[in-house]
């Protein structure tokens, strides 16, 4: 019975809110993005810059979960490889071809990017797990599922419907 008490009962339950307070970045932290840009930038680059601001915030940086269903380089995210690494439970098992480059493909046991390969459903499932962690584990995460718009919902539409039913909290960036 002790284990059931620690788990707060015999039936699984989703909590409507989490108990931990997160200190979010102030709007001023994003001032470089809010000011007029000298030259045009893509929305993807704007997102990566905003993500970099959030990664500097000590309260939420470990809660950020960038999930990419395909090659991160095409989204301009290769700068994050060295900064936070690509999650791999076994770490780097090979020498990357691009090892000599500044933004080489760095896999790490403590990596934060989930690089799912061409597996939209797997990436969507990872996003759903992180997006509902607040209610199932009292552990609020901030997941970003980054995908190609032309493939996005066509491949994970049902999963998105499920996310709505489970009151998932996260971002879909297409």
Regions found by a protein language model. Give the residues of each.
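Thiamine diphosphate
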Residues: 1-174
């Amino acid at each position: 019975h002790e284990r059931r008490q620690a788990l707060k009962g015999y039936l699984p339950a989703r909590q409507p809110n989490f108990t931990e307070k997160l200190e979010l970045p102030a709007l001023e932290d994003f001032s470089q993005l809010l000011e007029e840009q000298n030259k045009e930038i893509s929305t993807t680059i704007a997102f990566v810059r905003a993500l970099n601001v959030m990664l500097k915030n000590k309260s939420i940086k470990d809660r950020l979960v960038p999930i990419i269903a395909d090659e991160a380089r095409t989204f301009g995210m290769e700068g994050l490889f060295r900064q936070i690494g690509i999650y791999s439970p076994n770490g780097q098992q090979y020498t990357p071809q691009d090892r000599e480059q500044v933004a080489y493909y760095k896999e790490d046991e403590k990596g934060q990017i989930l690089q799912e390969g061409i597996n939209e459903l797997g990436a969507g499932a990872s996003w759903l797990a992180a997006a509902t962690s607040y209610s199932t584990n009292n552990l609020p995460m901030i997941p970003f599922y980054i995908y190609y718009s032309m493939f996005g919902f066509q491949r994970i539409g049902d999963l998105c419907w499920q996310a709505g039913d489970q009151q998932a909290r996260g971002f879909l960036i297409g």
